[in-house]
Amino acid sequence: MKKMKLAAIFAGLVSVFTFSSCLNDGDSGPNYDLYEIVTVEDGSIFGGPVLKGDAWGYTYTPVASSVLAGLKASDGSYYKRVQVGIKLMEGEAITEGKKSYKVSEVGLIAILNYKDFNVQAATLKNEYALVSLEDSNNKIWAINGYVNVPFTFKTKEQLNMNDFHLYAVEAKEDTLVTRLQQTKGADDAYQTGGALISFHMPFNDMEFRDIFDQVVPKSDTIVVKVTAKGENDKELVSTVKCSASNMQGSY
């Protein structure tokens, strides 16, 4: 079977603070059928966890819980956002129009940075200028409840995810306006770094929900607009269209 590659939007996922977990050195791993960035969705009383893919909208169901053993953190919970190699169950094949597949092997390639939207934006005291909201490899995308934001920043010290916050600002017709804010840094910072963070929409938070519910979808499509403070008083803006029902489906 011809291998399917990640869509171009997912190329070059390199972050100065991505926690990577790769295959053993010198071992190319199983002969995977495809590679995906996925969201790990917890199971219900009717079944175990499944993987929801970003690139093609596929759902991957493991044939046994042990298939996802490599996606567990030390506390036994599953990482929510990961890049993986996937081996389809024998007899399965990628078919046009088919969106659900059973998988026999899943290999962890990288753990993505992920966190919730900030719902206490009023407490964020500092805001430092970002270099850009996109890079040559990635633009923002939104799927399965996550807004995925690649960005470039400047710093004089080591930073982590907790130094960057995305929060909802307002609804404008079919658009949810958000802001990405860097709260740790220095005005004379000179080192440049790049990162990708998957921000989860907190639909269980009433303040966020009130803003989101004011967005008016057009045939289920909404726009997520990410803004940020840029250098030299420039306002950075990046937008993406996504499915309103898909974004709410996993909360």
Each model region followed by its residue ranges:
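Bacterial Sec-dependent N-terminal signal peptides
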Residues: M1-S44
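Beta-strand/loop nucleic-acid-binding surfaces
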Residues: A55-D75
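Flexible glycine-rich surface loops and low-complexity tracts that mediate binding to linear polymers
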Residues: G70-S100, V223-V226
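Short, solvent-exposed, Trp/other aromatic-anchored flexible loops in extracytoplasmic proteins
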Residues: D75-Y78, A186-K229
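Beta-strand elements of well-folded, non-transmembrane domains
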Residues: E90, F153-E157, K184, D205, ...
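Surface-exposed beta-loop interaction hotspot
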Residues: E92-K154
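Short helix-loop boundary/capping segments
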Residues: V131-G194
